[in-house]
Amino acid sequence: MAVTLKVNGKTHALDIEPDMPLLWALRDEIGLTGTKFGCGIAQCGACTVHIDGQPMRSCSVPVSTAAGKNITTIEGLAGADGKLHPVQAAWIAEDVPQCGYCQSGQIMAAAALLKEKPNPTDADISGITNICRCGTYIRIRRAIHRAATTKA
């Protein structure tokens, strides 16, 4: 079945089943591998993308639900000019990543949080972070606060 997805400003016509999880369409059909598979049950957050500006766990969203909506992945978060999003820049400045596996989901969740709450509290940040097996939560928190000061 034909499904049309608008990802990072580009339209993709795909011949896939409508119940395919968006995660696999992004990774396997479109080739955007920045969004990671972690758990497959929308619990860990590694697969977080924005759908019409809202953070969503792409492993549990059927492509039929995402069709016709604006989807942004980690690859599309930076500006068209290549300038990093303030959250991405803060991630680098605070030396957040270790293994990096959860990072795209963490960054996407943080960008959505800052859009909704420009000056988040520590409790706000704790409410949106993903599972990080490396335990970089203190650096993640610092990076989100840093990004907030640069008006993400």
Annotate each predicted stretch with a short phrase.
Residues 1-152:
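Signature of N-terminal electron-transfer/Fe-S-associated modules in redox systems
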